[in-house]
Amino acid sequence: MPPGELIYGFGLQLLSFSQRGKKKTIRVNADPKVDTGDSHAPVPFYVTTRGYGLLVDSARQVDFYCGDARLKPTHSAKAASGAVNTPDMTRKLALQDPGEITIEVPRAKGVDVYLFAGPSMREAVQRYNLFSGGGLVPPEWGLGFWYRAEQHGDTEAITKLATEFRERKIPCDVIGLEPGWQTHAYSCSFAWDSNRFPNPKGFVSNMGKQGFQVNLWEHAFTHPSSPLFDSLLPYSGNYGVWGGLVPDFAGEKARNVFGDYHGRTLVDIGISGFKLDECDSSDFTGGWSFPDFSRYPSGVDGEQLHAVFGLRYQEAVWQEYKKRSRATYSLVRSSGALATPYPFVLYSDLYGHRDFVRALVNSGFAGLLWCPEVRDAKNSEDLVRRLETVVFSPLAMVNAWYIKNPPWKQIDRVKNNAGELENDWQTLEARCREIIGWRMQLVPYLLSAFESYAANGMPPFRALILDHPEDSALAEVDDQYMIGDRMLVAPLFAGESERKITFPEGKWCDFWTGKVVRDKTISAPATTERIPVFVRSGSIVPLAQIGPHAGSSESTTLTVRVYGDGSLSWQGGGVAGIGLTLTWDEKNQKGSVRQNSQRARYTVAGWEQLGAEA
């Protein structure tokens, strides 16, 4: 490694961004506390600013020494200066000196290593994504707004919540049910609690009539009371978790048994997706998961199964949707290498806002999707800033599993569950409704970004440095990111007086006002009303009309924004049902629409130009 070459990647890293000078251990673990490489979704893949990527294909724990493993000195020398060095100073020296990447797989007899050529860093990532099978295009409803209800909710409570959302004009596509839908959780029965949900099929059908998809929480550890238990027993490990079986998802038979049950009993009554929880490990969270020395019928041990458990769990469920030619967009708490095609989005029980944004930025290096979910907040500012971030992410969700009322009605958890609402909760609700509305407007643009993900491997959400590896000013920017080919997002964080925003080369316009940005860096004060979002000057951006859900008739009507001279046309393909190419004639101040697919469902109602310069 020459001086100045930088390293990025290793999957869902929440605690660091640029990795040169560090040691990373690729090991699946929930809620990492320190920057070791442990993660919900670690990936033994990295890219460098020299324009290549490298994948170590192993289910064993892999150690990467990113320029910090150095041979001993062989000659005596005098002190270079009288300065007192610190660990941070020595890491900076590691960036300035030549180095090497050393990879150790202690418990493997051999591994396959794949080298992905660029010539640019972004092209190396694209090649990795295409090698993995290419990205996914979510269903429209998956890119709408999600809300997970309180865990004890029953048919009456969930129906009341859904009705309230429609009556108060809060857009929502997906309602998530947490552990209480089952007869037993921790471990799971995967059977409906008939007291809370006496008619599951009717409940799901009624939700669908209102435009809601239903998503179910679960984890894979299977309780003895489960209808699945006896058939899964021969295909499980020799150790249990929470009194339940550990399915051997490394083997096809376990995946088929587990998946078939889900298909017949849940997918076939209309369940649109699942939240696959607790499928990582637990060295930092109580040690509840299966041990590394456990054994499985497929021949793997616990260490290997931890590495692939989340991936193969996804596969077991996803195959049931593929059999039925149905799309899903689901949640999972662990994933890994080559997951690019999987229609699952990661989440965490951690809750640092900055860590969540950093995870979103890092996810684009490794073919992963990440949801910086909103659960609760310190105050109204924190709620607003977190909600602003999540609507500019792969999956926009409020996870209210432990509060009975939406957080905008009462932020305090105890008071919320006691029914003590804020006196003026409607004001905060209105602000949150507006922010959720932004998400609904963005759905066509997001769909086109995901189409590029599927077609050419372009990560829909990614770090600025990935597009501009030559720009040293972007090397450490882990709190801004690109969406698609023309949008830059810089989240705000509660309690901070201002934030610095750094721009890549080119001319940029404020997304909200069209104002042209002329500086390399600017500061946004905490009083900024809206999350800072910018687009490349010349961009055309379609915005959908806000409807009750992404599949509503209103949502297929577009207003097209033109920034600057409109020289960057926009295209939405037929895969996502958009099927339009939008262009702008600056001379005649006129937009044009060309339909490029018979599947086109969207129509253009009007155009507006922002940021035009005389």
Each model region followed by its residue ranges:
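Accessory, solvent-exposed terminal regions and/or long lumenal/extracellular loops of proteins
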Residues: V535-A614
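Catalytic-domain carbohydrate-binding cleft regions of carbohydrate-active enzymes
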Residues: M1-R530
